[in-house]
């Protein structure tokens, strides 16, 4: 329990823990390797202007434009908090479900907006992009774009690394411009270390490096 953690941390028995170990210890915080996105259902939000209005709402911008009379956000119970601007939208219903129920509702397309948690441990950023190919079973946006599909084909055949990176960036930008896939947040994991323990770091992909850890008694 918390009291036991604080006791262990105070006397040096506990050198590091993921979680909370008392106010006296400042954590090292890094990505947990998961990025949250909002996916907009293009079958229900078929007009680009409507999706862009939702995008502006998500960004907390004023003058968001014409929004649908009713919207449903499908999310997980343990997902990050809904942004204030979105939570205050009077025409929004938040449907926060356990994973199995969330998955069933997601597969049935019972949403206007979908909160999607995506692991960053893919070997290739193009994996996520392929979810939005017209024929993909994971196309939760119901997105159908010949331009985007052509971009994916070019990504798949490009062998020059820098050119391929540019194509991937362009495809991701297209999804954002058309308000289909919108980055929301990056999950964080705090690591609480004893004051004598230093040198532990975490990179943007959530990979912890303990190789440079040092303990000074």
Name each model-derived stretch:
Residues 71, 92-94, 182:
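Hydrophobic anchor at the start of a short beta-strand
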Residues 19-21, 42-43, 74-78, 117-119, ...:
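Structural motif
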Residues 3, 44-49, 77-81, 97-100, ...:
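Soluble non-cytosolic domains of exported or imported proteins
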Residues 5-26, 89-132:
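Periplasmic binding protein-like
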Residues 54, 73, 86, 106, ...:
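Hydrophobic, well-ordered secondary-structure elements that form the walls
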Residues 79-90:
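Short, polar/charged alpha-helical segment
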Residues 25-32, 38-48, 105-109, 130-157, ...:
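Short, solvent-exposed loop/beta-turn-alpha elements that line the ligand-binding surface or hinge
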Residues 11, 33-77, 159-179:
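Alpha-helical secondary-structure segments
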């Amino acid at each position: 329990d918390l009291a036991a953690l604080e006791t262990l941390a105070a006397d040096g028995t506990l050198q590091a823990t993921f979680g909370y170990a008392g106010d006296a210890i400042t954590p090292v915080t890094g990505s947990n390797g998961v990025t949250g996105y909002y996916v907009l259902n293009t079958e229900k939000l078929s007009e680009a202007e409507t999706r862009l209005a939702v995008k502006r709402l998500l960004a907390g911008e004023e003058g968001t434009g014409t929004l649908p009379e009713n919207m449903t956000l499908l999310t997980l119970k343990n997902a990050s908090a809904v942004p204030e601007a979105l939570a205050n939208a009077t025409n929004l219903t938040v449907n926060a479900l356990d994973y199995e129920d969330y998955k069933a509702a997601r597969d049935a397309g019972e949403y206007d907006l979908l909160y999607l948690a995506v692991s960053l441990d893919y070997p290739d950023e193009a994996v996520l992009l392929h979810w939005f190919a017209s024929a993909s079973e994971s196309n939760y946006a119901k997105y159908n774009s010949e331009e985007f599909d052509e971009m994916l084909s070019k990504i798949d055949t490009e062998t020059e690394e820098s050119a391929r990176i540019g194509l991937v960036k362009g495809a991701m930008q297209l999804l954002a411009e058309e308000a289909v896939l919108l980055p929301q947040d990056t999950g964080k994991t705090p690591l609480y270390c004893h004051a004598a323990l230093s040198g532990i770091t975490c990179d943007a992909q959530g990979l912890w490096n303990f190789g440079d850890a040092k303990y000074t008694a």
